């Protein structure tokens, strides 16, 4: 199964070769997928090659061959332009147009509770490809939120268990693009994969730190990580 970005790149290469007979340049691929650097394109091409979708032809510049396309290929699928907060769609169904998290809405209980949109699932483990979609709303105590816009995510994985965040929990996130060292954040890696981790700085780099010794801390250049919001609350259902 391909991630959204992998599929976008594969179809962009395929359509360009149909039009001109030659693959696009790395700069063209970077711009088409709205990535910050060509290193992200190199990683996507390597992943496509490992999965048997493309082949690099030796001793030739810009030499790529598309071997196969996804089974659900549609010519109408085009690389996205721009960026939006990213999580996995709750139903794992067809991606819907992205929309910014809506402000929390008061509910009819004397203003003590507010409704927060659940935007899907977030990885607390290995980062997972992500899209944004408002699946449903939940009601939370108003004093949990404070100021700003908020959204909720359902946790998938066990990498944050030592921080008290378990698989199946719902985390409440304050929307924002900045974080302080030690904050637990929603982080987008390479404009492709979303994960819930503790934010640290290692010199000029950014470290995404798990709260489970089974997972390694991952270090990235600052251009590869975008903060999507900070953890402000957690809801757990007992069955």
Curated annotation (Swiss-Prot):
Gene Ontology MF terms: DNA binding; serine-type endopeptidase activity
Species of provenance: Rhizobium leguminosarum bv. trifolii (strain WSM2304)
Assembly notes: Homodimer.
UniProt keyword Hydrolase present: yes
Site (Cleavage): 124-125
SUPFAM superfamilies registered for this protein in UniProt: LexA/Signal peptidase, Winged helix' DNA-binding domain
The protein's Enzyme Commission number: 3.4.21.88
Gene3D superfamilies cross-referenced by the UniProt entry: Umud Fragment, subunit A, Winged helix-like DNA-binding domain superfamily/Winged helix DNA-binding domain
Positions of the catalytic residues: 159, 197
Chain segments carrying region Disordered: 80-108
GO biological process: DNA repair; DNA replication; negative regulation of DNA-templated transcription; proteolysis; SOS response
Protein family per UniProt: Belongs to the peptidase S24 family.
UniProt-recorded name of the protein: LexA repressor
Keywords linked to the UniProt accession: Autocatalytic cleavage, DNA damage, DNA repair, DNA replication, DNA-binding, Hydrolase, Repressor, SOS response, Transcription, Transcription regulation
Catalytic reaction annotation: Hydrolysis of Ala-|-Gly bond in repressor LexA
InterPro entries: LexA (IPR006200), LexA-like (IPR039418), LexA/Signal_pep-like_sf (IPR036286), LexA_DNA-bd_dom (IPR006199), LexA_repressor (IPR050077), Peptidase_S24_LexA (IPR006197), Peptidase_S24_S26A/B/C (IPR015927), WH-like_DNA-bd_sf (IPR036388)
């Amino acid at each position: 199964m391909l991630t959204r970005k992998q599929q976008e790149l594969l179809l962009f290469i395929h359509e360009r070769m149909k039009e001109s007979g030659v693959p696009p340049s790395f700069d063209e691929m970077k711009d088409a997928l709205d990535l910050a650097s060509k290193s992200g394109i190199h990683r996507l091409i390597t992943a496509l090659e490992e999965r048997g979708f493309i082949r690099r032809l030796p001793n030739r510049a810009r030499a790529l061959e598309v071997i196969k396309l996804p089974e659900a290929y549609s010519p109408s699928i085009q690389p996205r332009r721009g960026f939006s907060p990213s999580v996995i769609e709750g139903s794992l169904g067809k991606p819907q147009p992205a929309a910014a998290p809506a402000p929390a809405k008061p509910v009819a209980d004397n203003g003590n509770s507010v409704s927060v949109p659940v935007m899907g699932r977030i990885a607390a483990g290995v980062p997972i490809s992500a899209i944004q979609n408002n699946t449903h709303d939940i009601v939370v105590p108003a004093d949990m939120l404070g100021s700003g816009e908020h959204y909720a995510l359902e946790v998938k994985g066990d990498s944050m268990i030592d921080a008290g965040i378990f698989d199946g929990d719902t985390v409440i996130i304050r929307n924002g693009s900045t974080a302080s060292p030690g904050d637990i954040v929603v982080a987008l890696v390479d404009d492709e994969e979303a994960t819930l981790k503790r934010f640290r700085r290692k010199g000029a780099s950014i470290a995404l730190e798990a709260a489970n010794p089974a997972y390694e801390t991952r270090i990235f250049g600052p251009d590869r990580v975008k903060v999507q919001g900070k953890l402000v609350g957690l809801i757990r259902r007992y069955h």
